[in-house]
Amino acid sequence: MRLISHKPLWLALVLPLVACSTTAPPAQVATPVPMGWQAPLPHQGSLTDMARWWTQLQDPLLVELIDAAQAVSPGIAQAQSRIAQARATQVGSRAALLPSLDAQASASRGFNDQLARVATTSQAGLQASWELDLFGANRAAKTAADERLAGAQALWHEARVSVAAEVAQQTSSIRTCLAQQQVAERDAQSRGETSRLSQLSERAGFTAPATAALARASAAEAQARASQQRMQCDVEVKALVALTGWEEPTLRTRLAQPVAAAPDTLFTVDALPAQVLAQRPDVYNAEREVAAASADVASAQAQRYPRLTLSGSVGAAQVRTGGVTTDLNTWTIGPLALSVPLFDGGRRAAQTDAAQARYDEAASQYRAKVRQAVSEVEQALVRLQSTAERADSAR
């Protein structure tokens, strides 16, 4: 009869569990991507490995400069720190799925009323607890942590590629500047010699004073351009010193060495935009953030439902009084505790709404990131095509 009297109570607790379920928004967001590029593809567009594209330039100095810049880059250091933070969060989320085990020990001495004498009591034990995660709150939190770790790793790759691109662009700019400086200095030297000869001819009466004056002005103008070009090259070199941490004399010595011509085909672009975008770490990170935000919504929804926790303990105690020692061993399984949210002033509902809003934001940012990536690739293709046309015209 006693068991029957408790049956309605258990039914009242179990039936709500059956009706509870979580519905998270989709972890992947459909984004319209063009079927093909509008700009022409270089070399008919075949896919190659872009992990270390700078090694394909056959420029040992550039590889050294990029490695040095990546070693001292604060952006890469921050990306590594974010990976460490994301990995720590992932470990914590995994731990929430496992039982917890704590050790306890105590000792006391005092008067025992039952024994009517002073007693020393010592005890030690293990306390275990495990949340059964009925509705997947902890599993969803782990999924979100996994996705954010993947996104943090993608941002680390993006930081590396960004530093490599910046160093490559700066190095190319310096070499172009130095080549222009040589042209400007030769031009200044040539015009200076022309001015000197014009002055000699003027003194001999073979050249009009106006012609000699024009030659002097031309020489002064060429000298000013050469000086301006040297200043620009010095600024470019100092910027590269700041990027790489190299000593300036060493950098200038290495830059003065001859450079092998870069291959015509450095890398190519796939004909399908979706495959190209899949290589971009920033797009991948935005995609992973959408998946993480979806898991956050599921976790927030699950927090509104009942929670079931199983506890247990095992221990040993010793009581010593009047020269007599008594040993006691204990163990328990339970209680099996069910916690049912009844009223929280709307806190859990607000947390769910906030998680949904963050998901909507992440989805919007992902779509914007895809559009931006398509635009950047299109612009880069246009620049590549223009550069190829100018190179053909210069030959």
Model-derived features: where do they sit?
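Transmembrane beta-barrel architecture of outer-membrane proteins
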Residues: L62-E64, T121-Q123, Q169, L214, ...
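Amphipathic alpha-helical coiled-coil scaffold segments and their short linker/junction regions
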Residues: I66, Q70-V72, G92, A144, ...
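A short glycine-centered flexible hinge/capping loop motif at secondary-structure junctions
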Residues: E202-F206
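Small/polar (Gly/Ser/Thr/Ala-rich) solvent-exposed segments
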Residues: L97-A119, S129-R160, L178, Y284, ...
